[in-house]
Amino acid sequence: MFKFQTNGFSGYAVRYSPFYDNKIAVATSANYGLVGNGRLYVLSIMDDGNIITDISYDTQDGLFGVAWSETNENHVLTSSGDGCVSLFDTTLKDYPVMKFTEHQREVFSVDWSNIDKNLFCSASWDGSVKVWSPGSNRNTSLLTLRSLASREEKTGRIEKPIPVVQPSQVPMSKTRPNIRNDNNDCVYDAKFSFHDPNIIMSCNSDSHLQLWDTRLPNPLFMDFVAHNGLEALSCDFNRYRPFVVASAGVDKLAKVWDTRMIQPNVHSRPPRALNKFMGHEFAIRKLAWSPHGPTQLLTCSYDMTVRVWNDSPSPTSRVGLLDGASQPHAPPCSKIFSAHTEFVMGCDWSLWGEPGWVVTTGWDEMVYVWNTQRLQ
């Protein structure tokens, strides 16, 4: 296990470089992301296990998301609390080379397409997912996908805002007024499919998992409640099984879905997950499928642990198929990493080198690099 401390800044997101097995980008925020500045760290893992800072960038607002470019090994995207997405060139100091400023609230995730490598998407608390093309030197979005508006158009029903109790208005941003989203459709995560460049998946605060096809006049083609009405915080496509996705949320569950089994009728009962992983004591903040096989899933949680799960193809190990059991048996996780001493907010797998290497970061101002296969 290797470690690095982001002194004074809490980790929110971390990603391995798609070009190098020893390069990591970490998005951090001061004061736990509630108010204050942010900092982007670009780190290198040395042969002796030390982790050093190649370069860092201070930002005017806290950083919540990070992604590497798929076309340039020196380009890194960040998303921040002021609604801004910034593109940094690590060969240049101090300032981003491009900024994208259409979002009206915090941007919690960014993801670069690994098929159409000219595109990335961003997910925001303003209820939208936006698609961008920085390669054309264009800082306006190509497409905006609106969670609630698309659902109302699809169902023909106008949904009333869910009342949210807010005893105190703590600003998440010091550079832009904290605009309330009374529709409760804050989008936490959005990902491009690994199998189709036109497909995007997103999850939001009203528990919906949504799939979009950017070629369609109404892009929303699948929409269902994934986490029992509680906030859905993270989602990911399986790299080896085109129709299999995973989601995680405040209900403390990571769920595996086969999209071929989801009924298109939004008025039907909630769909049944292919598998459920139970074990975290608090909400799961982030999950990621392994790039080295179709079954391993990594989750990190507010319970300060990181867990590795095995989505076995055996029917007897899948909770979703055990409706006849009075006490369904939860598939045990294969590994538990408990070095973090605060909320674990971000995790990622290394694409290169020996399979099993992952990186995690959290509010304890620590970045840990460790191998899931060597963990006892």
Swiss-Prot record:
Disruption phenotype: Specifically disturbs in the peroxisomal import of proteins containing a peroxisomal targeting signal type II (PTS2), and fails to grow on oleate. Transmembrane segments: none annotated. Keywords: Cytoplasm, Peroxisome, Protein transport, Receptor, Repeat, Transport, Ubl conjugation, WD repeat. InterPro entries: PEX7 (IPR044536), WD40/YVTN_repeat-like_dom_sf (IPR015943), WD40_repeat_CS (IPR019775), WD40_repeat_dom_sf (IPR036322), WD40_rpt (IPR001680). WD repeats lie at residues 58-98, 102-142, 182-222, 226-267, 279-319, 339-376. One of its GO terms (molecular function) is peroxisome matrix targeting signal-2 binding. It is found in: Cytoplasm, Cytosol; Peroxisome matrix. It comes from the Eukaryota. One of its GO terms (biological process) is protein import into peroxisome matrix, docking. PROSITE patterns: WD_REPEATS_1, WD_REPEATS_2, WD_REPEATS_REGION. GO terms for cellular component: cargo receptor complex; cytosol; peroxisomal matrix; peroxisomal membrane. Polyubiquitinated, leading to its degradation by the proteasome. Ubiquitination is dependent of PEX5 and PEX20 and takes place following recycling into the cytosol. Belongs to the WD repeat peroxin-7 family. Interacts with PEX20. Receptor required for the peroxisomal import of proteins containing a C-terminal PTS2-type peroxisomal targeting signal, such as 3-oxoacyl-CoA thiolase. Specifically binds to cargo proteins containing a PTS2 peroxisomal targeting signal in the cytosol. Cargo protein-binding triggers interaction with PEX20 and formation of a ternary complex composed of PEX20 and PEX7 along with PTS2-containing cargo proteins, which is tranlocated into peroxisomes by passing through the peroxisomal docking complex. PEX7 receptor is then retrotranslocated into the cytosol, where it is ubiquitinated and degraded. This is Peroxisomal targeting signal 2 receptor. It comes from Komagataella phaffii (strain GS115 / ATCC 20864).
